[in-house]
Every structure is written in structure tokens, then in C-alpha cells.
UniProtKB/Swiss-Prot annotation:
Protein's organism: Gibbon hepatitis B virus subtype ayw3q (isolate Hope)
Region described as 3 X 8 AA repeats of S-P-R-R-R-R-S-Q: 184-206
Domain of life: Viruses
Function description: May regulate immune response to the intracellular capsid in acting as a T-cell tolerogen, by having an immunoregulatory effect which prevents destruction of infected cells by cytotoxic T-cells. This immune regulation may predispose to chronicity during perinatal infections and prevent severe liver injury during adult infections.
Ranges: Sequence repeats: 184-190, 191-198, 199-206
InterPro entries reported for this sequence: Hepatitis_B_virus_capsid_N (IPR013195), Hepatitis_core (IPR002006), Viral_capsid_core_dom_sf_HBV (IPR036459)
Major location (coarse): secreted
Signal sequence segment: 1-19
Family the UniProt entry places it in: Belongs to the orthohepadnavirus precore antigen family.
Name by which UniProt lists this protein: External core antigen
Keyword field: Disulfide bond, Host nucleus, Host-virus interaction, Repeat, Secreted, Signal, Viral immunoevasion
Region spans: HBEAG: 25-27
Amino acid sequence: MQLFHLCLIISCSCPTVQASKLCLGWLLGMDIDPYKEFGASVELLSFLPSDFFPSVRDLLDTASALYREALESPEHCSPNHTALRQAVLCWGELMTGCSWVGNNLEDPASRELVVNYVNTNMGLKIRQLLWFHISCLTFGRETVLEYLVSFGVWIRTPPAYRPPNAPILSTLPETTVVRRRGRSPRRRTPSPRRRRSQSPRRRRSQSPASQC
């Protein structure tokens, strides 16, 4: 707990441990869920095991490769882009603070505690945030929410009554693609009518020429 107060002193600019305790009490008194406005929740994300999420480095590389132009743009693209920007900046500031703590702590054991705490606790939260918003931008928010619900139902079902393999996010959009393909013939039905309607016009245009 003292280590957490030390992080609060650095990140929240609290001058003393007592002030950091007051800051901690204020933070814990607020019911803030970063996923609420997107239709999800921290509890829903907690159904996914910690080893499910890629490393922060892999997630940052993915975000940079797919959405770097939009993330660096001064324009507002979407709420997911904004949240992804904030998560990336938060991780950068956290790494800067940890580097400062590591350079100023002479005790190797204390430095190791800081690194382990950041990687196991704060690192997991950042990985969850990055994965959620990257997935929403890649597959669509509704698809991600459907996947979280499906995985939550699967993981809470006894092994004897559930499929052997967990749901896979990348396979969910295929069902929507199939549905769209099923609707496509209905959209294509007017095309023969257009061809039939065009044929009399051609005959009418040709009839004066034949009379002449």
C-alpha cells in the first residue's frame, strides 16, 4: 500500500503520504467505469483471462499500424479513437513516472516492486483498454460486445455443458457477412426490371429510324 501511495505522490502531485491517502479516498468514492459509455463494463472485461490480452507493446504496434493517422489527427474521429489516445498517453506517462522512480530508488528490491506492480496491475488495465478500443475500431462495437457476452456465458457454463473451445472474436463478423450476403439478392431484384424497362425504350428509339 505504501508503494501505491508513492505512485500517487508522483502522479497526482500529492506532497505527502497523508495527502495521497486523501486523494485515494476521493478516487475510491467515485464510481468510474471507463467502459460504461461503450456499453461494456469492467466486470464484463474481467471474464477474459489476463493471458488473453496481448502485451502492451504488441497492442501499441497494432494501434500505430492501423490507426496512427487517425490518432495523430486533430479532428475528432470517434469516442473509441479518443479513448485509445488517452490510453496510449496514460501508458507513456506511467512509463515516464516509473523510470523516474526506478532511477531515484537506490534499493533494488523497491525498484523491482515498482516494476512488478505496474506490470501486473496497471499494465493489465492498460492492456484491457487498448484491446477493447482497438477491437471496437477493427470489428465494430456491437461485435465486440456480442463477443464479451458470448465469452462470459461460455466461461460461466460448466465444462460438461459447454463447447470445448471458447468463442473467437475474428469469427463473429463472418456471420454478419453471411447475413448481408443473404440479403443481397433482394437488393439485386430491381436490376432485371430495369433491363426490361430499358428494352422498350430502345425499340421506340429504333422505330422512327426504321420508318424513315
